[in-house]
């Protein structure tokens, strides 16, 4: 059956034909580009043609930003002198409309503050390998993000309870907290107590390799009465493992 002439999608190409990517409808181009990360768009996709560049400049393209860093670039000169400026450009293109950002490895105090200063409407912040800046960067950013609803942190060193308290006090709308430790774990309930004390609105909490005991667990269950899901994975000081659904 032949395709309808009113179809919004381009007809299939015949053998020997070539697609003119510049003639794709803007909504289809946008759908394609949204499957790429911020770096791929800014380094490559926006250079395909003028029409693609126009789509890439649209603030609606930058409501969600995924910054995926290749492992071989971690700690490289290119990461900080090429990639970081591109990521700042992505934040600028959102024109204050950024709602969600996920960052792999490219985490430092100045960049986190750059995001927070220009994205007061941010709802989700996800960072991987943020050990060098957890004490200042995440806390300083959180103080400028009162609408933040989800915080997802993967870190190597211990989190201080004072830092979590500031986050909880600065982000009253926080509903999801994920703390994933990839380093050494110490038996300690301070983090759990900080969560219980300052984050009563949590609905979803995930702790990976946390040193809390049953005392900390009970404090969380009492201090966060709206919890729907509590995921405890490799938390070796308690007997409950897996997801607790209330």
From Swiss-Prot:
Residues annotated as transmembrane: none
Domain F-box: 18-65
PROSITE patterns according to UniProt: FBOX
Signal peptide segment: none
This protein's name: Putative F-box/LRR-repeat protein 9
The species this protein was found in: Arabidopsis thaliana
